[in-house]
Amino acid sequence: MLGRRIFSPAPNRGFILCNLIQSNNSTRRGFSDNRKFNERNSEASSNVGFQRRVRSNIPSYLSASVEEGDIYSPNDLLFETVKAKNQAKFYEPVREDCFKTVNENPMNYWKNPVILSRFVTELGRIKPRGDTGLTAKNQRLLSRAIRRARAAGIMPTKYKSVYSEN
């Protein structure tokens, strides 16, 4: 099937680009057929926004969880109330930076694979800052210390150290 594009004026919409698919026998439609098609298409396109809003999926964590038989007040169904309840669920306490609490520099521990292996995965990759709970500066210094220990041959590169605490 071949398609052609027709610009047709629609009321209060400007020009609408319509894709018309020719029939299987590949005959051209007359002008009156195109006008009827474009009028029907413009009526359908005026409802598109409404249909899109109705069909939009609201995430489950933003909708109130009310089941049959529950007693609720209208305030429980407000968006702000539901959002506040869900934010409380996802809250995680901030982890403390262990190097900052003892006021030490992670670079001082590059010769100690037991301490450094706490910040390495089983496959030898340096854990990200979200997992370690370190500040950005100490995470940077720690990764530098781990790389230095690997270059010196103190720590393995492809797996976690056998002599680690964990």
Curated annotation (Swiss-Prot):
Stretches for region Disordered: 29-48
GO cellular component: mitochondrial small ribosomal subunit; mitochondrion
Pfam families from the UniProt entry: Ribosomal_S18
Keyword DNA-binding tagged: no
Subcellular localization: Mitochondrion
InterPro entries documented for this protein: Ribosomal_bS18, Ribosomal_bS18_sf
Record text on subunit structure and interactions: Component of the mitochondrial small ribosomal subunit (mt-SSU). Mature yeast 74S mitochondrial ribosomes consist of a small (37S) and a large (54S) subunit. The 37S small subunit contains a 15S ribosomal RNA (15S mt-rRNA) and at least 32 different proteins. The 54S large subunit contains a 21S rRNA (21S mt-rRNA) and at least 45 different proteins.
Record-stated family: Belongs to the bacterial ribosomal protein bS18 family.
Protein name: Small ribosomal subunit protein bS18m
